[in-house]
């Protein structure tokens, strides 16, 4: 069973195979259609469903479809009617090219059962493509030298159609030079071409244009054409020829590089390389031309490449050669002449020759300093040069001969004003615009010793304290010299002279280089109050010049002298005074008086007295006047008092530090002595006066301090206002000023006339300072002194109502002496410089013309008054010495009386002190005045010798 079953299956398989083979063979039957190319869309091809034996109703159920190996979109089947139609444009040449047969193969497939049918659609050719040449224009290049019958091949046309539509016929447009050679069936190797029938001449006919036409064999005929552009190639049979054989060009000098000079041009009848011309300079041209110019080988432009200078070369001759590029080059020649035009391009040139520098400042006008040469390389007016000089210089230009100028001195020189000049000479030509050049030279002015050293001031005032150390620097003088170098080197020296019995150089010295003035020895105010001398400054020029300056050295006082006790009685020495006093004397009785003087001045000579008890209660028994030195009793003596009293009186000055001397007074009390006739009223008044003296002194000190402060402030302001005043005449002149120092030391008078020299450097020592102290003579002598002072004018002097202070501490100064720097107090005549209060409690109101001295000035305020002459002092004229002046730091008043040269009569104010009494007026003759002056001079000489 199993084998039968197996046999049955194999039988079924065989039957199925035969069935499928039969269907395949039936489907492989082919249907053929034919259509022309370029058929329109929808063109009927065939009833494919009917031809395949298929019903129209079966097409859709059996999925009828058409497939193509080529382009399936060309043909399509309408499933409604079973017709095959053209779906898109069919181009046989595109589809099959130049193939002789062209068909479209379709496969028609149906399902249920599956059947495949082959359909072939033949595409027939139509004459739809004209013959075409590869290009519309064909360029042919034929040399004019080609021989006749030369064959030139041509490329034929092509036709996309086939068959008769592709059979082509050629024809050539008529011409004289070429004919068309057509290929035949037996000459296919040679092909289509042109044959030269006439010789070519490029210069006559450079170009030939022909038209080649082709026609196919279709109906209707289609044609195509190509334009043959035959260019006749040149043969080098013509030489280049220039437009002109000679070119003349004018070229300004100094044109920049690259400037076009001229453009030469040559022509060649040939063309191509045979007509291409290369320009160049001839081989025999000068190197200078090649250096200055350049020619473009293609354009023929000649340009400037070097500096063109008319002064170097006025014209250039250039030979130009033109050569073509033929195989056998031909050449042509021409000449270019370049004429250089002169322009004003050269600045004038200046040169200094024969310089004579430096020039001395004292050179005369007209001195030649330098020789200047000028030149200009230009010609004509461009080369005409004129020179000028800078303004405001003491020089001028003088034209000596052609192209030469002399620089000469036109005015006087002064090196101190201008030490050197920068002289600028300007040379300008006559061109338009003109050119100019400058040359400068520095003219140095050599110095000549024409200026003497000059001091800043004609006179200096110096204040030096006495007892200075030897070699002390007291001042520095400085002089300026406007000259230079050796002429400005200043050396200083003293103007030697004698000061009394000694030389000036023994007192001071001056450093030759620095001008420092040194004191060689300690100066003594008591010996020398004013040292006036001159310092000379001389330069190192030849000859040397010099000038002098005056120095006034005021020696300021220091407290270097202790008070000196006077010995009023003969045989008494050692400062011990013995007195006998009766026990019956009352209070206030003057027992003794201590007398002392101080060689110093001012406060240093202001003495005060103080009682120092040496035993027991002597202090309560006696007292001493603070400034008078009078020792008086303080009470009535009794029996209990010791019969011998030893009193120690301390005499002290007001210096800093103060110096003290001690005086011893031995008082012996005796019985039944004469009773002093001292009125009780006077004693009471004295007692009250002495008691109030201390209180008054306190206020006086306060007032002095206030006035001193105000005085210093006034002095500073006054100095600032008068600092610019130039003295008209020095203090030490030919007249003899007399300095009178007045002082009083109590109810006694001590007179010592001391004459001291004021040393001057300008004149011989003719000035004396007269120092007066209270006289030892009685009141009658003092009266005579007052009378001599009053009688000098011949009439009574009226009192000054504005003067109510001590004349011993008041001074006016109106002089040309410069004392401001040291703070010397100055004022006009009649104007007080310093005022001091007075104490007049113990005295009645003073009479007109009488004032009391200040408390503490060494004057007894109870008994001393001051008297003076009438009227205001005389106004000092220019060159006159002041009546009074005060040295700072010293309260003493120095009164200088200046006597006229022709009249030795003393007419200045004379100050003295005396007890309050009525003054007497007397007149003295001139002879008596002269006799008195001689006596005073003799006393002064004696005093100086004692010192």
Swiss-Prot record:
PXXP repeat positions: 734-737, 774-777, 796-799, 829-832, 870-873, 888-891
Glycosylation sites: 257, 265, 438, 440, 442, 548
Residues in the Extracellular compartment per record: 30-697
Gene3D superfamilies in the cross-refs: Cadherins
Region of interest: Disordered: 761-805, 824-853, 891-947
Region: 6 X 4 AA repeats of P-X-X-P, residue numbers: 734-891
Cystine bridges: 96-102
Key words, A-Z: Calcium, Cell adhesion, Cell membrane, Disulfide bond, Glycoprotein, Membrane, Metal-binding, Repeat, Signal, Transmembrane, Transmembrane helix
Keyword Cell membrane included in the entry's annotation: yes
GO terms under biological process: homophilic cell adhesion via plasma membrane adhesion molecules
Protein location: Cell membrane
Miscellaneous comment text of the record: The protocadherins alpha are expressed from a single gene cluster similarly to immunoglobulin and T-cell receptors. The N-terminal region containing the 6 extracellular cadherin domains, unique to each protocadherin alpha, is encoded by one of the large exons found in tandem array within the gene cluster. The C-terminal region, identical to all protocadherins alpha, is encoded by 3 shared exons.
Record's protein name: Protocadherin alpha-4
Lineage summary: Eukaryota, Metazoa, Chordata, Craniata, Vertebrata
């Amino acid at each position: 069973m199993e084998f039968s079953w197996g046999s049955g299956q194999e039988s079924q398989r065989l039957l199925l195979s035969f069935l499928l083979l039969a269907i395949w063979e039936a489907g492989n039957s082919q249907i053929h259609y034919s259509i022309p190319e370029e058929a329109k869309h929808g063109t009927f091809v065939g009833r494919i469903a009917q031809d395949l034996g298929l019903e129209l109703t079966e097409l859709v159920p059996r999925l009828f479809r058409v497939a193509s190996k080529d382009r399936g979109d060309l043909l399509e089947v309408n499933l409604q009617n079973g017709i095959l139609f053209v779906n898109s444009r069919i181009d046989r040449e595109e589809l099959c090219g130049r193939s002789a047969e062209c068909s479209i193969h379709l496969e028609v497939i149906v399902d249920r059962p599956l059947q495949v049918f082959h359909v072939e659609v033949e595409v027939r050719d139509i004459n739809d493509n004209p013959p075409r040449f590869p290009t519309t224009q064909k360029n042919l290049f034929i040399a004019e030298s080609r021989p006749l019958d030369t064959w030139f091949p041509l490329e034929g046309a092509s036709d996309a159609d086939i068959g008769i539509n592709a059979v082509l016929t050629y024809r050539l447009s008529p011409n004289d030079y070429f004919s068309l050679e057509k290929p035949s069936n037996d000459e296919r190797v040679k092909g289509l071409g042109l044959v030269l029938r006439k010789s070519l001449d490029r210069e006559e006919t450079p170009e030939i244009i022909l038209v080649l036409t082709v026609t196919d064999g279709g109906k209707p005929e289609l044609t195509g054409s190509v334009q043959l552009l035959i260019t006749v190639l040149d043969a080098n049979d013509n030489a280049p020829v220039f437009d002109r054989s000679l070119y003349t060009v004018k070229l300004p000098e100094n044109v920049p590089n690259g400037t076009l000079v001229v453009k030469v041009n040559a022509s060649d009848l040939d063309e191509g390389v045979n007509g291409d011309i290369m320009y160049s300079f001839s081989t025999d041209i000068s190197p200078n031309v090649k250096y200055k110019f350049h020619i473009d080988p293609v354009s023929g432009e000649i340009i400037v490449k070097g500096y063109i200078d008319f002064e170097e070369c006025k014209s250039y001759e250039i030979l130009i050669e033109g050569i073509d590029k033929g195989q056998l080059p031909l050449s042509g020649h021409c000449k270019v002449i370049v004429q250089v035009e002169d322009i004003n391009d050269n600045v004038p040139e200046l040169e200094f020759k024969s310089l004579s520098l430096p020039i001395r400042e004292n050179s005369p006008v007209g001195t030649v300093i330098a020789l200047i040469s000028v030149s200009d390389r230009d010609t004509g007016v461009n080369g005409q040069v004129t020179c000028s000089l800078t303004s405001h210089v003491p020089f001028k230009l003088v034209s000596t001969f052609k192209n030469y100028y002399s620089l000469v001195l036109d005015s006087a020189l002064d090196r101190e004003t201008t030490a050197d000049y920068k002289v600028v000479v300007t040379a300008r030509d006559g061109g338009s615009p003109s050119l100019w050049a400058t040359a400068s030279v520095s003219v140095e002015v050599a110095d000549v010793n024409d200026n003497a050293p000059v001091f800043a001031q004609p006179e200096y005032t110096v204040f030096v304290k006495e007892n200075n150390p030897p070699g002390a620097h007291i001042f520095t003088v400085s002089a300026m010299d406007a000259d230079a170098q050796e002429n400005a080197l200043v050396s200083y020296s003293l103007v030697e002279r004698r000061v009394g019995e000694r030389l000036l150089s023994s007192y001071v010295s001056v450093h030759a280089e620095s001008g420092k003035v040194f004191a060689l020895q300690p100066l003594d105010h008591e010996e020398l109050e004013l040292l006036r001398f001159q310092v000379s400054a001389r330069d190192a020029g030849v000859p040397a010049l010099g000038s002098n300056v005056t120095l006034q050295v005021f020696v300021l006082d220091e407290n270097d002298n202790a008070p000196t006790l006077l010995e009023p009685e003969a045989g008494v020495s050692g400062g011990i005074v013995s007195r006998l006093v009766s026990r019956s004397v009352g209070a206030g009785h003057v027992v003794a008086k201590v007398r002392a003087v101080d060689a110093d001045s001012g406060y240093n000579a202001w003495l005060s007295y103080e009682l120092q008890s040496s035993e027991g209660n002597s202090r309560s028994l006696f007292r001493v006047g603070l400034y008078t030195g009078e020792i008086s009793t303080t009470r009535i003596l009794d029996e209990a008092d010791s019969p011998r009293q030893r009193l120690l009186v301390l005499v002290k000055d007001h210096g800093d530090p103060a110096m003290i001397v001690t005086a011893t007074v031995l008082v012996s009390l005796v019985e039944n002595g004469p009773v002093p006739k001292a009125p009780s009223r006077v004693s009471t008044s004295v007692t009250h006066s002495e008691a109030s003296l201390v209180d008054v002194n306190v206020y006086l000190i306060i007032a002095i301090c206030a006035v001193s402060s105000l005085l210093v402030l006034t002095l500073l302001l006054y100095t600032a206002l008068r600092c610019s005043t130039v003295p008209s005449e020095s203090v030490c002149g030919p007249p003899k000023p007399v300095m009178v120092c007045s002082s009083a030391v109590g109810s006694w008078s001590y007179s010592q006339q001391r004459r001291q020299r004021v040393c001057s450097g300008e004149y011989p020592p003719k000035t004396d300072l007269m120092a007066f102290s209270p006289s030892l003579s009685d009141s009658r002598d003092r009266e005579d002194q007052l009378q001599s002072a009053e009688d000098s004018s011949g009439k009574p002097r009226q009192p000054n109502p504005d003067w109510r202070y001590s004349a011993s501490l008041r001074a006016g100064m109106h002089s040309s002496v410069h004392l401001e720097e040291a703070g010397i107090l100055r004022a006009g005549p009649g104007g007080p410089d310093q005022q001091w209060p007075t104490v007049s409690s113990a005295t009645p109101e003073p009479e007109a013309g009488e004032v009391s001295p200040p408390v503490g000035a060494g004057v007894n305020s109870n008994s001393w008054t001051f008297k003076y002459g009438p009227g205001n002092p005389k106004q000092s004229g220019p060159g006159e010495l002041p009546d009074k002046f005060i040295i700072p730091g010293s309260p003493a008043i120095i009164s200088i009386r200046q006597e006229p040269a022709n009249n030795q009569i003393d007419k200045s104010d004379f100050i003295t002190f005396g007890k309050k009494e009525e003054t007497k007026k007397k007149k003295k003759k001139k002879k008596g005045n002269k006799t008195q002056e001689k006596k005073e001079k003799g006393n002064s000489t004696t005093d100086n010798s004692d010192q």
